[in-house]
Amino acid sequence: MERKEDDLKGGCWNQPAVAEEFETLKDLAMDFTVEDWKDLESEWDQRDLFWDVTLNHYQDMFSFTDTSQPSLTSQPDVREELEATSTEVPETKSSPLQSGFVEEDFSQIMEIFSNGQLNFEACIGEDWLNSFLGDPESLPRPDISDKESPADHQSPESKSGLSPGPPLCTREDAVMSASPEKTLTPVILKESRSDLSQEDSVQGHEKPYKCSECGESFSQSHHLIQHWVLHTSGEPPIWREQQRGLSQGAHFPMCPGTPASYESYTCQECGKRFSQNVYLQWHQKIHTGEKLCKTQSDSNLEGLSRSPSVEPGKQRLSKDTDSAKPSTIHGQDQEKPPTGESRDQENLHESQPGDRPSVLHPKPLRHQKTPTNAKCFRCKKCGETFSGAFHLAKHQRAHAQRLYKCASCPAVFNLSKHCFQHRKSHFPSAACECQGCRKSFNWRSSLIKHQAIHKGEKPYKCDECGKAFNHSSTLKIHQRIHSGQKPHKCSECGKAFCRRTDLTEHQRVHSGFRPHQCPVCARTFNRPSHLVRHRLRHAEERHFGCAKCKETFIYKEQLERHNKIHTIEGLYECKQCGEHFICRSTLNCHLSIHIRENTSEKVVGQNSQHTEKCFKNTKCRKAPNHSRYLGQHEKIHAQVTSGECDPCGETYDQSVQPICHQSICAGVKPSECAEPEKCTRNTSASEHHPSQREPSFKCDIYNRAFKQRAHLSKHQLIHITEKPFKCNECDRAFKQSNYLIQHQKTHTAEKHFECSECGKTFHQRSCLSKHQKIHSGEKPFKCGDCGKAFISGAQLIRHQRIHTGEKPYVCQECGKTFSQSSCLTLHLRIHTGEKPYTCGTCGKAFAQRANQRKHERIHTGEKPYACGLCGKAFGLRTHLQQHQRIHTKAKP
């Protein structure tokens, strides 16, 4: 519909049937604070550009589509261009609004713009105007009469009852005085162009704004601008469209910058570019570590509420405002600071009598958001900081008492959802089952993660070592190995771990909680992996076999370690004696022997890296090769250090001689003790008489006590009558798998370990080491009572039972006692009638191997025992002893 010229001259600019879509002046508001403009003072081109942007929008409001617009980047002087703009508007007969508006009203507006007489605060916004002009005091402002009633200056549209659209200003701001003699009626628009265009585009699904880079279309122009930021280089498509003259039919919002300087501010640290210096300063706070965590809204509101009324035309700015505000065009944020901080509060004060009324409507107060990298919430108990209050509340539950307990196991939790998730582990769901390996899971997400193993997908790769992982969380845990980060620390011993699960499993060592139990032998474990490894021994799943000696193993690493035996030399060599070892841990244990024997500086210097792993006790000469064993050994000295014998008055160190010295002097046997079931039977430093120390771990069957849980577990194997480990060659059964492995080596024909002195071969390296001590004459284990030395510690223990008279092994059939378990085993064959050893010549069976060997000498004629006087030889040692009595004339 066309509009008459007399209507325009009369000031009726907003008729209900308007064909042309106008923008509200509010959409042109660009609010900045003084701090923002100070950052842009050095860039005078930016000031000129913002003037050009404002004038161009006003020309779009009051001109026609075929009106040529002046260039935005070619205006040397702002005031000259403003004056020139008011006179360069052409006349077009095809437009009904040209003559009246362009000649009179628009020329008046341009004249007021150029002369600086227009009250911009009533049109644009005081925050934007003061920050735009720099110094608020340097702008000449007209005086608005306080005596005039606001109702006298209302527009005809407002009086006629027309409902305006988005309000641009209050009705008191309807009069904009250019001078006391000259007034200009403002434009009160019914709807803004952005609102109309948005409504039309939604109804018609039109997307007129198209990106020239990728061809994507948008219904709103600001969406196109936000999309263009994704393209790393080049100028905005809006500028290219305007340069080609293609934007006259559609309105594009203006960007706060020219195409040449769209992203002219570059960060020196990371190379990121920004369109304004204030955004660059916000971004640089990430590199400097500066964190503005305190919300300024409360302090701003308090400061503004107490501030006195300002004079008309003066600027209202809070002194507490310290954060810049990005420019807005058409109500859209052109760019947001990297820290995620919201815009400052504006128009917080209410209008006072005599004050100039506010232009824009007050907006609700919004707090600034905390930066994403800031941690402003601190726990009062442990001092740990968090970025949000929710995370702090979640962390504080860890300090509180755990309330949720699982009904199926002793596990407790501090969150109900964790307890619910744990309870599902006791009832696995059949729906979440892997079709490849038939493994079931409690959650579908766990099934999806597991299926990635079968697919072989490892998208997450470590930059340090190149190792790939299935999940990003696994990669983060792996990267802690390179960085050395161990955030999870044990409160009992101070040991740190990379993963929380490792800390949980470690804490079970202090608490003694072993939730994983073997259903076959009832043995408990504190880790599920240990239980899985243990159950493989019951199943006898030995998939890895040696190609040379046909020996089988459960794990692949055991086979790799075994293959090193067939090599000529071991990988690790001792620098002191030249002995080779397959494992480094075995070499470290061997080096501890040299360190105990020779404490010279030369030995310590040559093995400096290994001596750190050897821990020596200051009270005795015992030096275990691990700190854990040293800590267990030092507990003996902490509780019991020495004792005194009443009959003889002799003092002794019970850590070195743990056998009860009083029973030796008095001749009291352990069977005569008041509590024979608690008497010790060996020289282990962890098992003492109850008069010296009270162990904490007790056996329920024999009521026997032990100091360490491992000793109790080893003792409980005696009560287990079942022998699940059977030999396939001779059907012999064993209680432990290691005994079966040692036994199976006797059936193999190869003996890989050969003695270099006598050429004798052995199945195990430990047997060879014991045998070599015979040639060297080394007997490190010495009896403290008679001074007799032995090669091994087991021989010393058996010998010391002669002095104490201890016979802990009792036959259940006849009650006979024995000092050694092997003697009890041989004795039990009398009751059972078992004779496992058979002569290969005559088929005679024997209960003991020694008797079999003696019998075989009859068939072979071997006589190894010869008399030293007459040279006569005998097949048995007893026959030689009887013959020697002839020469000595001794009577039996």
Curated annotation (Swiss-Prot):
GO molecular function: DNA binding; zinc ion binding
Compartments it resides in: Nucleus
Zinc finger (C2H2-type) in chain: 209-231, 265-287, 377-399, 404-426, 432-454, 460-482, 488-510, 516-538, 544-566, 572-594, 697-719, 725-747, 753-775, 781-803, 809-831, 837-859, 865-887
Basic and acidic residues compositional bias, start-end: 138-156, 190-203, 313-323, 332-353
Keyword Nuclease: no
Comp. bias (Polar residues): 66-76, 84-97, 297-308
Site of covalent link Glycyl lysine isopeptide (Lys-Gly) (interchain with G-Cter in SUMO2): 476, 602
Domain commentary: The C2H2-type zinc fingers are involved in discrete Cajal bodies localization, interaction with LSM11 and the SLBP/RNA complex and histone pre-mRNA processing.
Descriptive protein name: Zinc finger protein 473 homolog
Taxonomic source organism: Mus musculus (Mouse)
Gene this chain is encoded by: Znf473
